[in-house]
Amino acid sequence: MAEQNAASTTGVKPSPRTPDFSPYLDFDRAQWRELRNSMPQVLTQKEVIELRGIGENIDLAEVAEVYLPLSRLIHLQVAARQQLTAATETFLGTSPSTSVPFVIGVAGSVAVGKSTTARLLQVLLQRWNSHPRVDLVTTDGFLYPGAELTRRGLMSRKGFPESYDQRALLRFVTDVKSGKLEVNAPVYSHTAYDRVPGEFTTVRQPDILIVEGLNVLQTGPTLMVSDLFDFSVYVDARTEDIEKWYIDRFLKLRDTAFRRPGAHFSHYADMADPESIAVARELWQSINLPNLVENILPTRVRASLVLKKGSDHLVERVRMRKI
């Protein structure tokens, strides 16, 4: 795929209801889809079905109207970063070196659809000729192993910032961005609800690295992984909608993944609907909602772009940071 007439503009203006002093440009879906700029559809319905998560309704229309414009925006930013790198090398009088990977962060609540967003971006960005090597790593692999979480008394805080090996995550992204030939990321099993001992995903000098996780936009007094992002996406929705999606997903997992051999949550597999819903709601209210309110939602303001979903799990509005 190649960008045609990249410097041209469609003349689409953000929603007039957005005040001029807002740090974001606000687009409804109709306005945002115009920024696709005649990009061809590169996915099939079969591919979209394979990429979407449990309970999501994403289809070819959603890809065309939301994700193709987003992939075009990121493509243009990658090209601009490559030009900046070339300008720096010209200034230094050095020969072109291994390009610095463009790093994208994808954040949002559990059950909001951030994993699907990350997978879609990976596939769409791979279709551009100028950056075909796109790797995706989730921060789940950087959760402390179950035994360590138990030792620290953090099992009930799993998914909260303190349950991650932040140093290892920062070191991983730093090594990738520094051009290291091979960098390994730990692998996490949702079935076992733990890291897989001795298993790693190897990243080899990608053009683009996507880092997806609950708390990837966190800041702190020292260098954080978010400081290394070139672009970031926050997948947003009303809290009550996310709660419903979480419960619906729990019920589907009860009938599928929880029944697999060795599943950590196998004790939920034979629960009736009323009991399952009560358990899911308790898990949401005691763990996932506090994490969203205290740690995840406050990082939304740091995102380069916010995808706002409606109750049907489809994107309704897009907010793009302008400063």
UniProtKB/Swiss-Prot annotation:
EC number: 2.7.1.33
Composition bias, Polar residues: 1-12
GO molecular function: ATP binding; pantothenate kinase activity
InterPro entries: P-loop_NTPase (IPR027417), PanK (IPR004566), PRK/URK (IPR006083)
Region of interest (Disordered), residue spans: 1-24
Main location: cytoplasm
Positions bound to ATP: G108, S109, V110, A111, V112, G113, K114, S115
Pfam families: PRK
Catalytic activity: (R)-pantothenate + ATP = (R)-4'-phosphopantothenate + ADP + H(+)
Protein's recorded name: Pantothenate kinase
Originating organism: Corynebacterium glutamicum (strain R)
Gene transcribed to yield this protein: coaA
